[in-house]
């Protein structure tokens, strides 16, 4: 239970350490995270901070949400995210505040959640990392076939959950234990070592690592 930030994946690049080592990093834009609601144990039963990120046209905002945002005095965003925190941290926030990138520090471990890139309909080899069958030596028809998917007349069906061909990607995915290489407070950017889920321009959620 700790405060995080919602951001946008800008893309990947590399930076160089003092010893000349090349470090692949993902650039995350976490600017303009604004507090829309502070939830307290007395009123809501738990302690949390709700933040908005991004922009949304007023014509695309429902009346209940517009009233909720007007009460906080913030503009609408296309993402509304809640972070549960400790009750003693609530005093540091109020509706309308900006949550800055400085809540993170260089060298800190974080978990980044995003939506993986959709790959469409894929076979079992690519989707589940199955091994291909023999290329020759008597095999002429089933090089990338998945093999048997069932048994005999008993049970007479394919069990639910059987790993087969199907849609791959476009699901929520989390990369755990990534290291923050640089915090750019002026441009509200995080540079995280390695890759994070999603395409360029997709939304991500950055939290302190649960296994740090």
Swiss-Prot record:
Single GO BP term: translation
Presence of the UniProt keyword Ligase in the record: no
Highest taxon above the source species: Bacteria
N5-methylglutamine PTM sites in chain numbering: 153
Any one annotated GO CC term: cytosolic large ribosomal subunit
Gene Ontology MF: a single term: rRNA binding
Record bears the keyword Cell inner membrane: no
PANTHER family the record matches: 50S RIBOSOMAL PROTEIN L3 (PTHR11229), LARGE RIBOSOMAL SUBUNIT PROTEIN UL3C (PTHR11229:SF16)
Summary of the function given for this chain in its UniProt record: One of the primary rRNA binding proteins, it binds directly near the 3'-end of the 23S rRNA, where it nucleates assembly of the 50S subunit.
Protein family according to the UniProt entry: Belongs to the universal ribosomal protein uL3 family.
Quaternary structure, from the entry: Part of the 50S ribosomal subunit. Forms a cluster with proteins L14 and L19.
Name the UniProt record assigns to this protein: Large ribosomal subunit protein uL3
Originating species: Dechloromonas aromatica (strain RCB)
């Amino acid at each position: 239970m700790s405060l995080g930030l919602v951001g946008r994946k800008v893309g990947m690049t590399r930076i160089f350490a003092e010893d000349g080592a090349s470090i692949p990093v993902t650039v995350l834009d976490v600017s303009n995270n604004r507090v829309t609601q502070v939830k307290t144990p007395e009123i809501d039963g738990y302690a949390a901070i709700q933040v908005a990120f991004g922009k949304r046209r007023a014509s695309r905002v429902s009346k209940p949400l517009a009233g909720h945002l007007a009460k906080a005095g913030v503009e609408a965003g296309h993402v509304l995210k809640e972070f549960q925190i400790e009750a003693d941290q609530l005093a540091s926030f109020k509706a309308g505040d900006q949550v800055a990138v400085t809540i993170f520090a260089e060298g800190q471990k974080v978990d980044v959640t995003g939506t993986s890139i959709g790959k469409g309909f894929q076979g079992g080899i690519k989707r589940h990392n199955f091994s291909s069958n023999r290329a020759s030596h008597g095999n002429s028809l089933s090089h990338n076939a998945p093999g048997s998917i069932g048994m005999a007349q008993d049970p007479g069906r394919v069990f639910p959950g059987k790993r087969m061909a199907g849609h791959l990607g476009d699901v929520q995915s989390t990369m755990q234990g990534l290291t923050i290489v640089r915090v750019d407070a002026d441009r509200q950017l995080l540079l995280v070592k390695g890759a994070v889920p999603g395409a360029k321009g997709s939304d991500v959620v950055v939290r302190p690592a649960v296994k740090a």
